[in-house]
């Protein structure tokens, strides 16, 4: 399979879309470049498949204890696994055989699934970011376990991906590379000279430009909300004389002074939990990885169809190969980002190494109410009694738990109070 875009149209070297002005179809390829690509694709396939399967198996063991964030991570891992199996694997096999080996129906199905996995992965990331936006900026709407709105957010990316990928079925077919040559390959026929430019521009907007714009807007609002929350905490600290004196809640005058003039969604929940901020950081890193991996791919593709002077020789082919491989790397990055933020998702051997290499956890003292006190983390852990939940409370600078963050508040802060030893 060629290493160019998933909607290749012109019979150029390696079948890329980078040479709309090419006049002579090529029947050969750069074998050395193909060998390098095959090796890289095989590595990407192993890493993406292994990493995402590890995440799926770990989350699958939680059963009904899965939180909202668990569901989004699970489905994002599914979309990345789809990229590995429906995009990377066919591309690897196609590079090995050079020409497409299969009937016309298989040609159309492969092209459809390749773009579907790209749409699904992008839109699932967007849905997860929207969920984090709602959790931070509209917390009262998210004080619940996975509900109808959550499942709608998860189903929408799959549905949109299935619809937006349909043009692939009609554009691609098994056709002769050169009329009368008898050499067949899975190529596109747009019907109009402007077809490749229009289709590629629309796909770039739908998969990259518009989603990145929405992701940027969401994170701008999230950062703004967190800054306002920090302002509330700072004002409360100053009004309270530099710290909370007892386990009791701050006085009504303190709360009134610190929340006056702020939106109700900020004053209704006095703090954004550390676990929630951690999930925001994780999603933000995933977004950065997505942009870093796919920006070169779409930049080169747009350059090839909009610049008549774009190179159409070997240099362009190398650039297309590198850009396409960078896009595939995104499916490798995501599962390791999950595991980096959540050590419990690591496979057991890696988890053991992480435990041996890291600092030993502090001893926790059991409080009279059965909760656990720790100075560093806010974790929900399940005790030996199935019906009992013990909560580790983070302490303030004065060494005492935050009075306004009761165990119940922390459980409900992200709508994920039944999770087991997790940060989301």
UniProtKB/Swiss-Prot annotation:
Origin superkingdom: Eukaryota
Protein name per Swiss-Prot or TrEMBL: Vasopressin V1b receptor
Gene designation: AVPR1B
Sites where a glycan is attached: 21
Species whose genome carries this gene: Homo sapiens
Parts of the chain that traverse the membrane: 36-59, 72-93, 109-130, 152-173, 202-222, 284-303, 322-341
Pfam families in alphabetical order: 7tm_1
GO CC annotations, alphabetized: endosome; Golgi apparatus; plasma membrane
Polar residues composition-biased segments: 13-22
Function as written in the Swiss-Prot or TrEMBL entry: Receptor for arginine vasopressin. The activity of this receptor is mediated by G proteins which activate a phosphatidyl-inositol-calcium second messenger system. (Microbial infection) During SARS coronavirus-2/SARS-CoV-2 infection, may recognize and internalize the complex formed by AVP/Arg-vasopressin, SARS-CoV-2 spike protein and secreted ACE2 through DNM2/dynamin 2-dependent endocytosis.
